[in-house]
Swiss-Prot record:
Its EC number is 3.4.21.-. It comes from Spodoptera litura (Asian cotton leafworm). Serine protease which, by cleaving and activating prophenoloxidase (PPO1) after immune challenge, plays an essential role in the melanization immune response to wounding. GO terms for biological process: response to mechanical stimulus; zymogen activation. Expressed in hemocytes. The clip domain consists of 35-55 residues which are 'knitted' together usually by 3 conserved disulfide bonds forming a clip-like compact structure. This is Phenoloxidase-activating enzyme 1. Residues 20-120 form a propeptide. Residues 121-370 form the Peptidase S1 domain. The keyword Disulfide bond applies. Keywords: Calcium, Disulfide bond, Hydrolase, Metal-binding, Protease, Secreted, Serine protease, Signal, Zymogen. The active site is at H166, D228, S321. InterPro entries: CLIP, CLIP_sf, Peptidase_S1_PA, Peptidase_S1_PA_chymotrypsin, Peptidase_S1A, Ser/Thr_Proteases_Immune/Dev, Trypsin_dom, TRYPSIN_HIS. Residues 1-19 form the signal peptide.
Amino acid sequence: MWKSLVFFVSALIWSFGSSQDCTTPTGSRSNCVSLYQCQPLYNAFEQRPLPTHVVSYLGRSQCGFEGYVPRVCCGPLPEEQEATSARPTQAPTQGSSDVFPEDSSPAPRNQCGIDTTGDRVYGGTITDLDEFPWMALLGYRTKKGTTSYQCGGVLVNHRYILTAAHCITGAIEQAVGTLITVRLGEYDTQQDVDCIDSVCADRPQEIRVASAYPHPGYSDKNKNRQDDIGIVRLATRAAYTYYVQPICLIDNRARLDTGSDVYVAGWGKTLNGRNSPIKLKLNLPIFNKQECDDKHRGEVLSSVQICAGGVFAEDACRGDSGGPLMKKTPNGIWEVVGVVSFGYGCGRDGWPGVYTSVARYIDWIQNTIASSNV
């Protein structure tokens, strides 16, 4: 949280750009402008020490960025707010179920990939409370009528989640159930209120699934899981906060060289064999493609797949299927470069995990989002 605040402070440089219509956290219509141009919120921001409830309200007022410059939906701070570090009893107000033109494409580069601070994760380290705010948990309605969270994904704009096709269709429907919900802004799945020391996060946003779109080329009968990528449309828009933000898609011209640093994150199995209730992160290297092909001879990997990991106790296995393989650009922006697809065992030395390459599906992602946002 305080890493978020440091980021927020360092971002305070003058922002030129046309204002846009927006809705404040209290429901009033206003304009999306630079924080410097919004006197009420700037005055609140100048308080020292900065109260936790003010930090939370500023975060919920953010409506985009210009580079690293935050823009806010300008309006007065509510006269009475409970100054508490606990999560509010209600989740941040979610957006309308109406169709918004800006939801027809992934979030623009100046509004995504900014970190405010196994398929399960092995050897991972615990994330900060507000780290990787685009992470999503996919929930399924089981035959017993309960909700089971079995896959991961990432938020790419207010309305859409990027995940794996095998998290949407095929065997998972029989083994687990029907995809019905997405949870955003989660940190510790065992706690109703996520706190580190005296700082607490907002309540996670639980949003119903409207529709899901596995890639048409995917079949769970194919052992190599080619085209293992999918899009989930939310029934209502996610509200951007410090704890919920979209990630950028990798440029389709970008290269990932062997040995490049990439990251996975999720709530997966740790070395003691148990799922982690707390969001973990893990740094992995891109694995040599030819060596990876040799390891997976029976699967015939294609050019649309990436191999990463292969270091003992450091890999992703089933619990975070559909979760992201990510990299940080030199200017500090996070991009999703891959989607967790499959692997053999967990954290086996010399055996990398296999990920669907996002760069090879940019056109399909954009077209699917545009055609379904109606």
